[in-house]
Amino acid sequence: MARVQRKAALRISSAYRTVSYAAVMVITGVIPIDIKVQERTAVFNKQVTKAEAREVSIGKWQMRWSKEVKGAWTRRLLPNIKPWVLRRYGEINHFVTQALSGHGCFGNYLKRIGKQDTTTCWYCNEKDTPEHTLFRCNRWTRHRIKAENQVGKELGVDNLIETMLENETSWDSVSEMITKIMKTKVEDERQRQKA
């Protein structure tokens, strides 16, 4: 069942198939199937209310996520899943998923999967990681500054998700920044492959 659920979550998030089950479930906000079955069973047997069962499920999921070995970058951005899972707005897309999973146009990922020989950033010769791309690379300063001006604070690993969850405007600003950066990187990667 978990395999089927993972496939569905990969489709929902437009994630690459290399993203771990644990990470893609958090990114999509879909409770893992085994925990969901326990939740539904408890409600069906009238042991708890739906709200109580959901609270227990999120607690179990959080404990599992905190101990998870895979999805380290996602866990760094999203250490606490409850606010993310319970949000009332904000959709993810392929580019946001790349940024949240670390599986996308990043030198460290492309080298790991054998698509390039180095982890070096194409724009500044630093090691290209999701953190570098989103928060440090000078190539994306304009997009970062625009988003930071809109949300009223400097963005970093420790506050990216918190900022997105503040309100719809912040979500849209950060999501737009991520999408523009990642979309440009994907287009640049295609051009590099043609050369």
Where are these regions (language model features)?
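Extended C-terminal regions of large enzymes
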Residues: 4-5, 20-95
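Residues marking helix boundaries in flexible regions
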Residues: 13, 49, 59, 82, ...
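Family-specific functional microsites
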Residues: 84-195
